Regions:
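Aromatic pocket-lining residues of Rossmann-like dinucleotide-binding sites
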Residues: 10-11
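Active-site nucleophile loop of the alpha/beta-hydrolase fold
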Residues: 16-29, 52
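Catalytic histidine-centered segment of alpha/beta-hydrolase-like enzymes
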Residues: 79-89
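Gly/Ala-rich beta-loop-alpha elbow adjacent to hydrolase catalytic centers
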Residues: 1-7
Length: 100
């Protein structure tokens, strides 16, 4: 989840596509980690998200609401924070390849 946070930040900074899974958009353990906001997401860099809505740590429905205006979001009911179905990310990789 924190890896996805950094993937979004670095994707924008270096103009690179990204695929994220169950991201933490508002890390709260350090003050110098600002929340991901519209400024971080509103651009033309291809980004895709995979969300398992059963995440027991983060509210993925709220995350989905925040992300779906800016990127393709694939969500599944159930799952958990460590990802029950990581193989589904392979489909997103193939979709991302279509951009290039």
């Amino acid at each position: 989840s924190l890896g996805a946070y950094w993937a979004l930040k670095m994707s924008k900074l270096y103009q690179l596509p990204a695929i994220i899974a169950n991201p933490n958009l508002s890390p709260c353990f350090r003050e110098d980690y600002p929340a991901i906001d519209e400024h971080d997401l509103d651009h033309d860099i291809p980004q895709l998200a995979y969300l398992e809505l059963g995440d027991e740590i983060l509210d993925m429905r709220q995350t989905m609401d925040q992300l779906e205006s800016f990127m393709v979001v694939e969500s599944v009911e159930g799952g958990h924070h460590r990802l029950e179905h990581p193989e589904r990310i392979n489909d997103l990789i193939h979709r991302l390849k279509e951009y290039f």
